[in-house]
């Protein structure tokens, strides 16, 4: 572990020197690239230096203990020595987690797709609740959300809705939402007070750079049409909505805002994200066939969470986490769940690196 940490610290120092070089400073691409890399190493280097300083402090205190005969000073030094010794395993544990390979997609913006599944109108209403929950959560992180495509339900909510979330580390925060979400509650129209169960599926796709996935113009079929809202009512009076079909795969992306130019850009962005996601899903399926992750397989059909309204309870089935905070969670306070899932995944990866042992 410490050989790795020495390499990280050496690279950090190299980056410091490079970021002082006028040739780098005057090249925006290189400046951004190296600044980003340095920022990613900063935490690891800070903790490693704290660890090394703590070990040095322990050696100094031990030397002072050998040299002194004063009882009061001995007592004080023993307390300091114990405090420093207690700090070491905590720093070592933190360093282990910091050395876990980072998901290369973590810093990317995302496309979130929510679809009503089983449950009819109630599922559509729940899809709307999930969209509101994620929008509120994005606000707490100062992320920007932008609706790409929406199909409203006649009785409220959405049959499906796609939206982008932009901000530093958006994928790292939202990637655990992939899967089937189940709600248990009494519908407003239910006179008998019976609890209904409905589901909605969530897909979180990392946005991609052009260099990461090639989409040739000749492989695209682009159609324009007049979009319609709930009940078939026309939202636009011109054919501004755009549908892009990737001919080799049959993958389709649409956008139906007012500007045709913006719709082309949005639809193409979603199309690329879906094609990239297909590659990721193939890789994850191969990986899942070899081992079971603590936070699930990432399969869209996997039931990951239940929202029980009568008991104000939210349960994440992947890690067995139950919180009696449904109201807060539906208001976008997802940190406790996201943090627990992040820790579970990191612990899982750490076990893998250590051949099954922590």
Curated annotation (Swiss-Prot):
Subcellular location(s) of the protein: Cytoplasm
Positions in coiled-coil regions: none
Membrane spanning stretches: none
List of residues that carry N5-methylglutamine: 233
Modifications made to the protein after synthesis: Methylated by PrmC. Methylation increases the termination efficiency of RF1.
InterPro entries according to UniProt: PCRF, Pep_chain_release_fac_I, Pep_chain_release_fac_I_sf, Prokaryotic/Mito_RF, RF-1
Gene Ontology MF, one: translation release factor activity, codon specific
Keyword entries, A-Z: Cytoplasm, Methylation, Protein biosynthesis
Any Pfam family matching the protein: PCRF
GO cellular component assignments: cytoplasm
SMART domains: PCRF (SM00937)
UniProt keyword Cytoplasm, yes or no: yes
Function summary: Peptide chain release factor 1 directs the termination of translation in response to the peptide chain termination codons UAG and UAA.
Family (UniProt): Belongs to the prokaryotic/mitochondrial release factor family.
Alphabetical list of NCBIfam families matching this protein: prfA, PRK00591.1
Protein name stated in the entry: Peptide chain release factor 1
Organism: Staphylococcus saprophyticus subsp. saprophyticus (strain ATCC 15305 / DSM 20229 / NCIMB 8711 / NCTC 7292 / S-41)
């Amino acid at each position: 572990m410490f050989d790795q940490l020495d390499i990280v610290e050496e690279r950090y120092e190299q980056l410091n020197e490079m970021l002082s070089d006028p040739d780098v400073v005057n090249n925006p691409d290189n400046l951004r690239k190296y600044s980003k890399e340095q920022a990613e190493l900063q935490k690891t280097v800070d903790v490693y230096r704290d660890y090394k300083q703590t070990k040095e402090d322990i050696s100094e205190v031990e030397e002072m203990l050998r040299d002194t005969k004063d009882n009061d000073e001995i007592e004080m030094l023993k307390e300091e020595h114990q405090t420093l010794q207690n700090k070491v395993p905590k720093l070592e544990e933190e360093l282990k987690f910091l050395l876990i390979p980072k998901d290369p997609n973590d810093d990317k913006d995302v496309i979130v797709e929510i679809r009503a599944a089983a449950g009819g109108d109630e599922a559509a209403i729940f899809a709307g609740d999930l969209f509101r929950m994620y929008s509120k959560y994005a606000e707490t992180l100062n992320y920007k959300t932008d609706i790409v495509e929406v199909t409203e339900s006649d009785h409220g909510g959405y049959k499906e809705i796609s939206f982008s979330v932009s901000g530093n580390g958006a994928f790292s925060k939202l990637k655990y939402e992939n899967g089937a979400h189940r709600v248990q509650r009494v519908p407003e129209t239910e006179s008998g007070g019976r609890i209904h169960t409905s589901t909605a599926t969530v897909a979180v796709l990392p946005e991609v750079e052009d260099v990461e996935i090639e989409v040739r113009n000749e492989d695209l079929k682009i159609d324009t049409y007049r979009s319609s809202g709930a009940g078939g009512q026309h939202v636009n009076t011109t054919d501004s909505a755009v549908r892009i079909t990737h001919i080799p795969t049959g993958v389709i992306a649409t956008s139906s805002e007012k500007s045709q130019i913006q719709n082309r850009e949005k639809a193409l962005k979603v199309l690329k994200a879906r094609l990239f996601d297909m590659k990721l899903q193939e890789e994850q399926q191969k990986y899942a066939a070899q081992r079971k992750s603590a936070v699930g397989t990432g399969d869209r059909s996997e039931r990951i969470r239940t929202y029980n309204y009568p008991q104000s309870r939210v349960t994440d089935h992947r890690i067995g986490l139950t919180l009696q905070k449904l109201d807060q969670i539906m208001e976008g306070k997802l940190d406790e769940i996201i943090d627990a899932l992040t820790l579970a995944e990191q612990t899982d990866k750490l076990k893998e690196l250590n051949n099954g042992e922590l």
